[in-house]
Amino acid sequence: MQHTTCTEDRIYHALERCLHGLSRDAVSSRWAAGLCLNCWSLQELVSRDAGNYLILVEKILGKAREVQEKCDYDLVMPLALLFYYAVLYAPHIPPDSELLLKAASIYHSFLTWPVPYCDVFRELLTFISDELKAPGISFQRLVRTEQGLPVKNYQSSTVTVLLLNRSEVQSEFLSIAEKLSSTEPPRHATLVLLLEHLYQVTFGTRCDLGSLHHLLKAKTLEELSEIYTSAAEAQEIAAASSDPVLARERLQSALRDIAGAAALPTIAGDAQPRRLQPIPIPTSRCYTYSWDQDNFDVLNDVLSKECSVVEPVASENEEDEEEEEEDVETDGCSPERDSLLSPISSISKDSVYSALSEDGPKHSCVSLFSSSKDSISELTVVSKKSLRSFVSSLKDCMDSGYAEDSDESSLDTLGRPELKVEKTHHKYRHTLTNKIYKLFKSKSQLVLRRDLKDCVDTGSLPLRRAESLCHPQAKPRIPARSRRAHSLPQHGLGQKLQTPQTPQLLSLPRRPFLSYDEDAKVATMRVVVFGSDRISGKVARAYSNLRLKESTCPTLTRYFKLQFFYVPVKRSCLLPAALLMHPPPSPSDLQLRALAQAEPTLAGAESSTNDISHYIGMLDPWYERNVLGLMNLPMDVLCQSAKPEAEPQEDSREQLPILADMILYYCRFATRPVLLQLYQTELTFIGGEKMTEVFIHSLELGHSAATRAIKASGPGSKRLGIDGDREAIPLTLQIAYSKTAISGRSQWNDVEKVCTSVNLSKACKKYEELASKTECLNLTMTEVVKRQNSKSKKSFNQLSVSQIKVDKVQIIGVQSSFAVCLDQDEQKILQSVTRCEISVCYRPRDSDPLALRRSSLTPQDPSEFHSLLCLPISTFSGALP
């Protein structure tokens, strides 16, 4: 196909605009208006003609060579994402073009780059390999997953849930969200689209797409389902083969046979003078909910609607599970978790991780059995239920860097294997080998659920460092600080909050271990939340509450793998919540609206920031460009859509607004999460009651929290009056904080200050601060140096503001109480607080009775390891080094 130089220049210029300003070292102005539309503009330009995708791929590969030569790390991830998009949407890539082979040779050299770049290109090479063997298979899998179309041996499903607060977002956001949730295409049209794409991407212009479209539309849903099932199975078989050339030939032969049997148009032998048609991806299945809670109970409604999709597969697994339980009951062995410590001690920790997370189920099974013959013989002696528990603990270990503790009494039985050998049989040995393969293959979630049934009253098992799996008697070692992704919390002292004079055992927090190769579940739920830092705080508390519920009784996580997406929205231009909850206007409402416009502070101006989204943008520049940048555009621009073609097809779908397209782009291509540290505060009230709350961004104490409560009252705040810190009544506070030094050590300080406000916020707000401990907090104290009495009735304070980076804080009111506000949330303002303790949030472990018993049995162990609780937010590249 021939293209003018003008078209190539336009595509190259659009590509350059997408990459402009992404380098952190580039000296440029802070003006970034409209840059978020560059990626959307490139996609809209390329989609006008099918040949433009090939031009874009060539330009991307040429740019990738330049990036490799210059070692420009900032452009690697955007180029990889753009290449994935171009190949995914390409209607047809001729085999003789060798574009994919050229891309494979270029991207193969990136495997020597550091993490996470090498991981990204490893996945990209797998994507290229699948496209060489089965063209368009990634497109097919994505559409099947988003539309909930099950195919044999590939029954995954993805649903998108949009959570919006009517008092937080504008009405245009609500209309766009409702439009996304109401544009689900019918299954008949989806099957027609998938078959058209499958034949066009495989045969190119040899397939008469117009005739194929009319014949497919005339068929019934049952006929289309049967045709597509056969075609999809042939494509999956081709992707599983090893020879790309042979796989394509067999796939083309199978598709010709299917077309002949279904009376579809005959495939021509040579290319015909036809025009390829770009086929867009249908809108994903979406649900929209109005959400303003500190829990995710609204997601249970999605579970009830989607249970018909996921339940059949779960029932088949449960049947296999019951058969395995019957075998376990006949063995008469007790569930002893530590019985595998000795046989597995010869296998290194890293080899187990790599086998389970990278090589897949079969390779992990082989690596375990190839460790040693003695290990195999000892494995056959162990109870089956112990093995299932061990596999379950390994999966947990992959997610958080921890393995589950177990009962120490099982070590006694481990030292006497002769008592168990007498009970073993040849059938038991053969059956156990098969169970190991099945367990490593797909059923970690079912095993975890069965363990929870057996241990209902024990709570969640405590977490211990993964090294103790292999060496339970090894001396604890403080892990050395290493260079890693900035979003992962660094190591630091984690002892419980106390006075500096009280001695305490050393306690070390452990950063979570991210694993992208988790055992595939039946379905994935994308949870997309819109809002400011106030809403991010609600997400943090809801996530903490969800983890606590799911650890005792799995419901959502039993069927869904949860992915969280965060779209920042400015709150400063919004009206009070009471005005938006009642749509029909009345004369009094109009007066309130006019008052809100005249008094911006009453409408929530500057009442909430977007620091969390800016922090994510520092970690992932592509997120900052394409998601955070949308916040700077006016709504009339975001509500526009691309103009339809001059000659639209007969069944062309309605064009979505720019905001809807970018939301779908974010959900489809952002697959790598960053971890945001959660913090907890233990509050003590005047009556002695205690409460523990979670926050993610900020905690305001004293006058700043009281002022926010007054502003939240709406127009009534004018009667109450809002004074600044100079007019505020000071508080005498005893403040103990752990100050962080450059070396990473912490030093406790105990002071008594007279303050009006004490605020804590996430410390990392600049690129330079990413290299330090990202879980630290900025302690800002507004101290009253001198109180001056004027001739009037009011007194004025002479203030001094100081800021300190801290790990933990303890604040006690001296004969006074104060107010506390979490994450700038007016619904989280707590009054009459006398004591406040703030620290990083850990995963719950103290509720386990086994942990309490072990702590009393082994007091000589001076150190403990805790796993930090972090909120995973999906981004395009994850946290870049």
Curated annotation (Swiss-Prot):
One of its GO terms (cellular component) is phosphatidylinositol 3-kinase complex, class IB. InterPro entries: PIK3R5/6. Its main location: nucleus. Residues 312-339, 472-499 are annotated as: Disordered. The keyword Cell membrane applies. PANTHER family: PHOSPHATIDYLINOSITOL 3-KINASE REGULATORY SUBUNIT, PHOSPHOINOSITIDE 3-KINASE REGULATORY SUBUNIT 5. This is Phosphoinositide 3-kinase regulatory subunit 5.
